[in-house]
Regions:
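A generic structural signal for short, non-catalytic loop/turn and secondary-structure boundary residues
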Residues: 24, 137-139, 226-229
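An amphipathic, basic-hydrophobic helix/alpha-beta surface used to engage anionic
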Residues: 58
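Aromatic-Pro/Gly-enriched surface loop or interdomain linker
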Residues: 83-90, 95
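Conserved GTP-binding G-domain of TRAFAC-class P-loop NTPases and closely related GTPase folds
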Residues: 183-259
Length: 259
Protein backbone atom coordinates (compact mmCIF):
# COMPACT_ATOMS: atom_id res chain seq x y z
CA UNK A 1 0.00 0.00 0.00
CA UNK A 2 1.21 3.50 -0.83
CA UNK A 3 0.47 5.77 2.12
CA UNK A 4 -1.24 8.96 0.97
CA UNK A 5 -1.15 12.22 2.91
CA UNK A 6 -4.72 12.83 1.74
CA UNK A 7 -5.91 10.74 4.69
CA UNK A 8 -4.48 13.25 7.19
CA UNK A 9 -7.22 15.85 7.65
CA UNK A 10 -5.69 19.32 7.55
CA UNK A 11 -8.71 21.44 8.34
CA UNK A 12 -9.46 24.97 7.19
CA UNK A 13 -7.06 27.59 8.46
CA UNK A 14 -4.57 25.20 10.00
CA UNK A 15 -1.96 25.51 7.25
CA UNK A 16 -2.01 29.30 7.01
CA UNK A 17 0.39 30.09 9.87
CA UNK A 18 3.65 31.48 8.55
CA UNK A 19 6.25 31.65 11.29
CA UNK A 20 9.81 32.50 10.33
CA UNK A 21 11.53 29.67 8.39
CA UNK A 22 14.01 29.67 11.28
CA UNK A 23 11.26 28.51 13.64
CA UNK A 24 9.13 25.35 13.72
CA UNK A 25 5.87 25.67 11.80
CA UNK A 26 4.06 24.74 15.01
CA UNK A 27 5.88 25.77 18.17
CA UNK A 28 5.98 24.13 21.58
CA UNK A 29 8.67 26.33 23.04
CA UNK A 30 10.55 26.65 26.31
CA UNK A 31 12.51 29.72 27.43
CA UNK A 32 14.66 28.78 30.40
CA UNK A 33 16.89 30.91 32.62
CA UNK A 34 17.31 32.59 35.96
CA UNK A 35 15.67 35.87 36.91
CA UNK A 36 16.86 38.94 34.98
CA UNK A 37 18.79 36.94 32.39
CA UNK A 38 16.86 38.23 29.37
CA UNK A 39 13.97 35.77 28.97
CA UNK A 40 11.30 38.46 28.61
CA UNK A 41 13.43 40.41 26.14
CA UNK A 42 13.84 37.32 23.97
CA UNK A 43 10.08 36.76 24.05
CA UNK A 44 9.37 40.38 23.11
CA UNK A 45 11.71 40.10 20.14
CA UNK A 46 9.79 37.08 18.88
CA UNK A 47 6.44 38.76 19.49
CA UNK A 48 7.20 42.12 17.92
CA UNK A 49 9.89 41.77 15.29
CA UNK A 50 8.50 41.44 11.78
CA UNK A 51 8.00 37.99 10.27
CA UNK A 52 9.01 35.90 13.28
CA UNK A 53 5.80 34.77 14.96
CA UNK A 54 2.55 34.71 13.03
CA UNK A 55 -0.42 35.07 15.37
CA UNK A 56 -3.85 36.70 15.49
CA UNK A 57 -4.91 36.06 19.09
CA UNK A 58 -2.42 36.24 21.97
CA UNK A 59 -3.09 34.75 25.41
CA UNK A 60 -0.60 35.65 28.16
CA UNK A 61 -0.77 34.03 31.59
CA UNK A 62 1.74 34.88 34.28
CA UNK A 63 2.78 36.30 37.60
CA UNK A 64 5.17 38.76 35.92
CA UNK A 65 2.70 40.95 34.05
CA UNK A 66 3.77 43.90 36.21
CA UNK A 67 7.00 44.09 34.19
CA UNK A 68 7.26 47.24 32.08
CA UNK A 69 7.62 45.22 28.88
CA UNK A 70 4.31 43.44 29.44
CA UNK A 71 2.56 46.68 30.41
CA UNK A 72 3.61 48.29 27.13
CA UNK A 73 2.69 45.21 25.10
CA UNK A 74 -0.68 44.94 26.78
CA UNK A 75 -1.55 48.61 26.39
CA UNK A 76 -0.42 48.59 22.79
CA UNK A 77 -2.32 45.51 21.69
CA UNK A 78 -5.46 46.35 23.67
CA UNK A 79 -5.37 49.81 22.04
CA UNK A 80 -5.17 48.27 18.58
CA UNK A 81 -1.57 49.20 17.81
CA UNK A 82 0.36 47.09 15.32
CA UNK A 83 3.56 45.17 16.01
CA UNK A 84 5.50 47.89 14.19
CA UNK A 85 3.93 50.67 16.26
CA UNK A 86 4.72 48.92 19.55
CA UNK A 87 8.24 48.09 18.35
CA UNK A 88 8.76 51.77 17.61
CA UNK A 89 8.13 52.60 21.28
CA UNK A 90 10.77 50.12 22.44
CA UNK A 91 13.29 51.16 19.80
CA UNK A 92 12.97 54.86 20.69
CA UNK A 93 12.69 54.54 24.46
CA UNK A 94 15.83 56.62 25.09
CA UNK A 95 14.13 59.61 23.48
CA UNK A 96 10.97 59.35 25.57
CA UNK A 97 10.37 61.71 28.46
CA UNK A 98 6.95 60.29 29.30
CA UNK A 99 5.65 56.96 30.54
CA UNK A 100 5.13 54.80 27.42
CA UNK A 101 1.69 53.64 28.54
CA UNK A 102 0.64 57.27 28.94
CA UNK A 103 2.20 58.04 25.56
CA UNK A 104 -0.09 55.51 23.88
CA UNK A 105 -3.12 57.10 25.54
CA UNK A 106 -2.11 60.60 24.40
CA UNK A 107 -1.36 59.38 20.88
CA UNK A 108 -4.83 57.89 20.50
CA UNK A 109 -6.58 60.81 22.23
CA UNK A 110 -5.01 63.15 19.69
CA UNK A 111 -6.31 61.14 16.75
CA UNK A 112 -3.40 58.81 16.13
CA UNK A 113 -4.17 55.79 14.00
CA UNK A 114 -4.08 52.25 15.35
CA UNK A 115 -3.64 49.82 12.49
CA UNK A 116 -3.05 46.56 14.33
CA UNK A 117 -5.24 43.48 14.00
CA UNK A 118 -3.88 41.30 16.81
CA UNK A 119 -6.23 40.63 19.72
CA UNK A 120 -4.80 39.91 23.16
CA UNK A 121 -5.85 38.67 26.58
CA UNK A 122 -3.68 38.97 29.70
CA UNK A 123 -4.28 37.04 32.93
CA UNK A 124 -2.41 36.88 36.24
CA UNK A 125 -4.01 33.51 37.06
CA UNK A 126 -1.98 30.65 35.60
CA UNK A 127 -4.38 27.87 36.50
CA UNK A 128 -8.15 28.35 36.48
CA UNK A 129 -8.23 30.90 33.65
CA UNK A 130 -6.11 28.92 31.18
CA UNK A 131 -8.56 27.48 28.62
CA UNK A 132 -8.37 23.92 27.41
CA UNK A 133 -6.96 23.79 23.86
CA UNK A 134 -10.33 22.52 22.61
CA UNK A 135 -11.91 25.82 23.69
CA UNK A 136 -9.79 27.79 21.20
CA UNK A 137 -11.00 28.72 17.74
CA UNK A 138 -8.85 26.58 15.45
CA UNK A 139 -9.53 28.96 12.55
CA UNK A 140 -7.52 31.62 14.39
CA UNK A 141 -3.74 31.66 14.78
CA UNK A 142 -3.53 31.33 18.55
CA UNK A 143 -0.39 31.99 20.60
CA UNK A 144 -0.21 31.10 24.30
CA UNK A 145 2.49 32.32 26.70
CA UNK A 146 2.88 30.88 30.20
CA UNK A 147 5.29 33.03 32.18
CA UNK A 148 6.47 32.00 35.64
CA UNK A 149 3.58 29.59 36.18
CA UNK A 150 5.62 26.79 37.76
CA UNK A 151 3.95 26.99 41.18
CA UNK A 152 0.50 26.36 39.71
CA UNK A 153 -1.06 23.05 38.70
CA UNK A 154 0.39 22.02 35.35
CA UNK A 155 -2.44 19.97 33.83
CA UNK A 156 -3.72 22.73 31.53
CA UNK A 157 -0.21 23.74 30.51
CA UNK A 158 0.59 20.12 29.71
CA UNK A 159 -2.42 19.95 27.39
CA UNK A 160 -0.87 22.54 25.08
CA UNK A 161 2.27 20.46 24.68
CA UNK A 162 0.34 17.29 23.91
CA UNK A 163 -2.75 18.62 22.06
CA UNK A 164 -2.19 22.30 21.27
CA UNK A 165 -1.17 21.86 17.65
CA UNK A 166 -4.55 20.32 16.86
CA UNK A 167 -6.17 23.63 17.80
CA UNK A 168 -3.82 25.89 15.85
CA UNK A 169 -1.98 27.13 18.92
CA UNK A 170 1.73 27.88 19.34
CA UNK A 171 2.94 27.84 22.94
CA UNK A 172 5.86 29.23 24.94
CA UNK A 173 6.55 28.32 28.56
CA UNK A 174 8.92 30.78 30.27
CA UNK A 175 10.50 29.26 33.37
CA UNK A 176 13.47 29.69 35.67
CA UNK A 177 13.79 25.92 36.08
CA UNK A 178 13.79 23.29 33.33
CA UNK A 179 13.72 20.22 35.54
CA UNK A 180 10.66 21.18 37.54
CA UNK A 181 8.63 21.15 34.34
CA UNK A 182 6.69 17.91 33.80
CA UNK A 183 8.99 15.59 31.88
CA UNK A 184 6.67 13.30 29.93
CA UNK A 185 4.42 16.10 28.69
CA UNK A 186 6.04 19.52 28.53
CA UNK A 187 9.75 18.66 28.37
CA UNK A 188 9.52 15.69 26.03
CA UNK A 189 7.03 17.38 23.67
CA UNK A 190 8.85 20.70 23.38
CA UNK A 191 10.41 21.37 19.98
CA UNK A 192 12.14 24.73 20.53
CA UNK A 193 14.31 25.40 23.58
CA UNK A 194 15.89 28.77 24.36
CA UNK A 195 18.52 28.44 27.07
CA UNK A 196 20.09 31.19 29.09
CA UNK A 197 23.13 30.38 31.31
CA UNK A 198 22.91 27.03 33.10
CA UNK A 199 25.32 25.30 35.45
CA UNK A 200 27.32 22.25 34.38
CA UNK A 201 24.89 19.78 35.93
CA UNK A 202 21.89 21.26 34.15
CA UNK A 203 23.75 21.35 30.84
CA UNK A 204 24.49 17.65 31.23
CA UNK A 205 20.82 16.81 31.87
CA UNK A 206 19.61 18.89 28.90
CA UNK A 207 22.21 17.16 26.73
CA UNK A 208 20.91 13.76 27.85
CA UNK A 209 17.30 14.75 27.11
CA UNK A 210 17.72 16.36 23.69
CA UNK A 211 21.28 16.59 22.41
CA UNK A 212 22.93 13.18 22.30
CA UNK A 213 23.81 13.77 18.64
CA UNK A 214 26.66 16.01 19.83
CA UNK A 215 29.52 15.15 22.18
CA UNK A 216 28.83 16.33 25.74
CA UNK A 217 32.11 18.24 25.98
CA UNK A 218 31.50 20.01 22.69
CA UNK A 219 27.96 20.85 23.77
CA UNK A 220 29.17 22.36 27.06
CA UNK A 221 31.91 24.31 25.26
CA UNK A 222 29.39 25.64 22.73
CA UNK A 223 26.94 26.73 25.43
CA UNK A 224 29.59 28.42 27.55
CA UNK A 225 31.03 30.24 24.53
CA UNK A 226 27.58 31.63 23.70
CA UNK A 227 26.91 32.66 27.29
CA UNK A 228 30.16 34.61 27.62
CA UNK A 229 28.28 37.49 26.00
CA UNK A 230 25.72 38.88 28.41
CA UNK A 231 22.10 38.16 27.45
CA UNK A 232 23.11 35.74 24.70
CA UNK A 233 21.27 32.44 24.62
CA UNK A 234 21.47 28.99 23.06
CA UNK A 235 18.64 27.95 20.77
CA UNK A 236 17.92 24.25 20.23
CA UNK A 237 15.47 23.63 17.38
CA UNK A 238 14.42 20.00 17.72
CA UNK A 239 12.68 20.04 14.33
CA UNK A 240 16.02 20.58 12.57
CA UNK A 241 19.03 18.32 12.17
CA UNK A 242 22.39 19.19 13.70
CA UNK A 243 23.67 20.14 10.23
CA UNK A 244 20.67 22.34 9.47
CA UNK A 245 20.26 24.70 12.40
CA UNK A 246 19.43 22.56 15.40
CA UNK A 247 22.09 24.39 17.45
CA UNK A 248 22.32 28.18 17.36
CA UNK A 249 23.70 31.22 19.07
CA UNK A 250 20.63 33.37 19.64
CA UNK A 251 18.00 32.79 16.95
CA UNK A 252 19.89 32.78 13.68
CA UNK A 253 23.62 32.09 14.10
CA UNK A 254 23.94 28.38 13.30
CA UNK A 255 26.49 26.16 15.02
CA UNK A 256 27.61 23.03 13.18
CA UNK A 257 28.96 20.37 15.56
CA UNK A 258 32.28 18.71 14.84
CA UNK A 259 31.08 15.41 16.32
Amino acid sequence: MQVSKSYAWRGAGKETRKNSPLLPSNIRGLIIGKSNCGKTTAMMNLLLQKDWLDYELLHVFGKSLHQREYKILRKGLESGLSKAQISNIFENQDALNIDPVKLIEIYLDQGGTADGKIKANFYSDCSSQVPDPTELNELQKNLLILDDCLLEKQAKAEAYYTRGRHNNCDTFYISQNYFRLPRQTIRENSNLIILFPQDSKNIAHIHADHCTDIDIKEFKDFCNAVWRVRYNFVTIDLTSSKLNGKYRENFDNFYFPNT
